[in-house]
């Protein structure tokens, strides 16, 4: 646990900006989703929220969608009245940037089930949360406190076959939060492709 906290702190320091910290209020944000609708974190006050950083061009993201792991995790969360916001912070100048309509089409093709998919092309939300990889996951409790930050699971590979034996950290965190417990592993090491910010 101590080493995980150290790793995550170093990741934040490397970002060159202040970023969200577990145990502190989750940074407020607003964005436009793939359907052109304005979405704010405040819209979901009083609800548990999951943030998922996603980029369809990343093989680590495709691992979790090709295996249907991410979709299953999204649907499990929805069944527990948890809000799930997928966030794409890829800058329009990057080669794997998708326009909102294309991003929406990709999510639909995958059978994804987020509450909304947000376009964060300027990277404001990503930088506020210190998101460095895709996928990268955050859980915010009903009080608006960031209670989990890190990876989707404990197996840092791009192989879909590895999902079955992996520990799903998001499911575990949600289980603790919804049971009124402190998250047992509030910080883990995220893995994946770098978030494609303008200066990355």
Regions found by a protein language model. Name each.
Residues 29-49:
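A short beta-strand-turn-helix
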Residues 139-200:
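Thiol-/selenol-based redox modules, centered on thioredoxin-like
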Residues 46-49, 79-84, 112-115, 142-145:
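Loop/turn elements at helix/coil->beta-strand transitions in domains of secreted/extracellular proteins
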Residues 62-110, 121-128:
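Structural microenvironment flanking redox-active thiols in thiol-disulfide oxidoreductases
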Residues 15-19:
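Sec/Tat signal peptide C-region and signal peptidase I cleavage site
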Residues 1-7:
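Positively charged n-region of N-terminal signal peptides that target proteins for export
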Residues 104-141, 146-147:
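Short, internal strand/loop/helix patches
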Residues 42-62, 174:
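Short active-site neighborhood of thiol/selenol oxidoreductases, capturing the structured segment around
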């Amino acid at each position: 646990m101590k080493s995980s906290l150290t790793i995550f702190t170093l990741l934040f320091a490397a970002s060159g900006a202040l970023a969200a910290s577990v145990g502190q209020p989750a940074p407020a944000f607003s964005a436009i989703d793939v359907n052109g609708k304005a979405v704010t974190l405040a819209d979901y006050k009083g609800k548990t929220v999951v943030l998922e950083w996603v980029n369809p061009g990343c093989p680590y993201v495709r691992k979790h969608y090709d295996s249907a792991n991410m979709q299953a995790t999204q649907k499990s969360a929805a069944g527990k009245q948890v809000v799930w916001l997928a966030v794409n912070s890829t800058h329009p100048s990057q080669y794997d940037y998708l326009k909102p309509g294309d991003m929406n089409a990709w999510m639909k093709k995958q059978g994804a089930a987020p509450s909304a998919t947000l376009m964060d092309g300027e990277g404001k939300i990503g930088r506020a949360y210190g998101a460095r990889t895709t996928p990268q996951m955050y859980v915010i409790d009903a009080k608006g406190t960031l209670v989990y930050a890190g990876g989707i699971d404990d197996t840092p590979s791009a192989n879909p076959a590895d999902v079955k034996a992996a520990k799903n950290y998001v499911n575990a965190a949600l289980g603790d939060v919804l049971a009124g417990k402190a998250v047992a592993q509030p910080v883990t090491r995220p893995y994946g492709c770098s978030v494609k910010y303008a200066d990355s």
